[in-house]
């Protein structure tokens, strides 16, 4: 079975200097089937990513059953698969100021080559959920070494509360001027009526030049060097009838380099039928960084 769905948006964006029109439309192909023994399988990709879907760069393919779910392609890393990101602000996500994305190392947030498919396994039994993900450590379908990523995560849900722990690691090839990286994540998610709260704390080591790029600093590139870092954040959103209001704040602190605080606030109004009015503002405390904002209409088909 093949189904078509999609989304679209139109509105205005403020980039810190000027207002610009902004619009987008996308079509999603979703394919699914079931074997005689009851195994479910399928795939999905966006129309504009059809070329990348042929090589696993974009889109995903899955097989699921009583053993869990196996997914390959542009899949999430284990931690993100269980914990997700902070509340998304604005109809364009406003991620050019840091955004709501938790700084995971692996999966579709990965620092490895974009044409390197990820394998993700997830399994749930009662209140427990586990996930594991990895790449094959090669560039595309070649024998050229690439960074090898691995991640594991587990979560426990009791009532309206979820707590979880994740670990991610990237092993760089010997020929690369990039240090090995790793990160441990703690996450907590809660629901109080119509209000959702999510918090996380992450601690580990980043490649020095990757860390410097976050602050628009010139790479050193003299040798592969790791620096300690930590990150933490909180988001809250609440729904009142057709209106949802939410925001986030998160901090990235890198030893010997700098620290930055990202924050955003937004609201949406559900018009019904798959349409909504959405707007938001976002900023950070980096030098020469101005507030960005957007306001527009989003559609789901």
Curated annotation (Swiss-Prot):
GO biological process, one term: monoatomic ion transport
An example Gene Ontology CC term for this record: cell outer membrane
UniProtKB keywords: Cell outer membrane, Ion transport, Membrane, Porin, Transmembrane, Transmembrane beta strand, Transport
Disulfide bridge partners, by residue number: none
Entry-linked SUPFAM superfamilies: Porins
Entry annotated with the keyword Ion transport: yes
One Pfam short name: Porin_4
Transport listed as a keyword: yes
Transmembrane segments: none
Topology term for the membrane: Multi-pass membrane protein
Entry GO MF terms: porin activity
UniProt subcellular location: Cell outer membrane
Self-association state and partner proteins as the record states: Homotrimer.
Function of the molecule: Forms channels that allow the passive diffusion of small hydrophilic solutes up to an exclusion limit of about 0.6 kDa.
Domain commentary: The monomer consists of a 16-stranded antiparallel beta-pleated sheet barrel (171 residues), three short alpha-helices (18 residues) and 13 hydrogen-bonded reverse turns (26 residues).
Protein name: Porin
Species for this entry: Rhodobacter capsulatus
Organism taxonomic ancestry: Bacteria, Pseudomonadati, Pseudomonadota, Alphaproteobacteria, Rhodobacterales
